[in-house]
From Swiss-Prot:
The keyword Ribosomal protein is annotated on this UniProt entry: yes
NCBIfam families: PRK01192.1-1
Entry's Gene Ontology molecular function annotations: structural constituent of ribosome
Organism name: Archaeoglobus fulgidus (strain ATCC 49558 / DSM 4304 / JCM 9628 / NBRC 100126 / VC-16)
Name of this chain's protein: Large ribosomal subunit protein eL31
Alphabetic keyword roster: Ribonucleoprotein, Ribosomal protein
């Protein structure tokens, strides 16, 4: 098992990014934005960010057109460069 290097809790605003996309694309873009946000803040590549299914289900909970306006997640970075994301 890899050793935990950093553990942080983030509140990610989604509303300001999702308003620019058509309604039918918003949940998909929100999920991609969460990955991009965490890769930037945890200083890893986007493919090294592993998002828990609970986070994805929370984004898609109200359908593709109405993702949540913000989401609170816990990100854990391991010494091998993998970041695991779960709901906080």
């Amino acid at each position: 098992m890899a050793k935990v290097v950093v553990e942080r809790v983030y509140s990610i605003r989604l509303r300001h990014k999702m308003k620019r996309y058509p309604r039918w694309l918003r949940a998909k873009k929100a999920a991609k934005y969460v990955r991009k946000f965490l890769s930037r803040h945890m200083k890893v590549e986007p493919e090294n960010v592993k998002i828990d299914t609970a986070v994805n289900e929370k984004i898609w909970e109200r359908g593709a057109e109405k993702p949540p306006t913000k989401i609170r997640v816990r990100a854990v970075k391991f010494d091998d460069g993998i970041v695991e994301v779960e709901l906080a």
